[in-house]
Amino acid sequence: RQRQMCIRDRNYILFRDYLCTHPDTAGEYERLKLALAAQLPTDSGREDYVQGKQSFIRSVLRRALSDMLLGKMVDILIDRPLGSHHPKHTDMIYPVNYGYVPYIFSADGEEADVYLLGVSQPVEKYKGRVIAVIHRLDDVEDKWIAAPTGVTFPPDEIEKAVNFQEQYFQHEIEMLDPNGDQ
């Protein structure tokens, strides 16, 4: 329960900070709240009002995490090293190192998942630079793409490297440009 509160508090701060630095998004959020309040004017509509905001909040949190992490160095704990089998789908073998960034939580409430590209040996942990984000359009999770400092990959190579798992999801790739800008 305490972990859930901590995640909720972090997400609230991240959401609030993003709205403060993106006035167009803040305005969009205010318009959404007004529209929902007009549709659900009684106290009995409170649950529907809260639910109506959730997808917007999730999408803002995803954008905020992208803004926060793209181009940054992160410490990755690898829980599925290159060559290992998926814990549930044992026929799936990881062609890349896969892990998570401790204490950075994604929209699903779990620590942010990361594909580590450009490292051809299985590793247990790695400090890499986030070069891209895979936004799953039919799931609440995003997946981060990290690589060694100075190494980049074009979108088609990223797509090929993560296809073993991402083929099951509609997604788009947000890239860090070679100059380090989004």
What residue ranges belong to the model's regions?
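A conserved hydrophobic position in a structured secondary element of the catalytic/binding core
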Residues: 2, 21, 101
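Short, small-residue-biased leader/transition segments that mark boundaries at the very start
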Residues: 3-7
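The feature captures the alpha-helical scaffold/lid subdomain characteristic of nucleotidyltransferase
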Residues: 10-67
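Feature detects long, helix-prone N-terminal segments enriched in hydrophobes
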Residues: 63-182
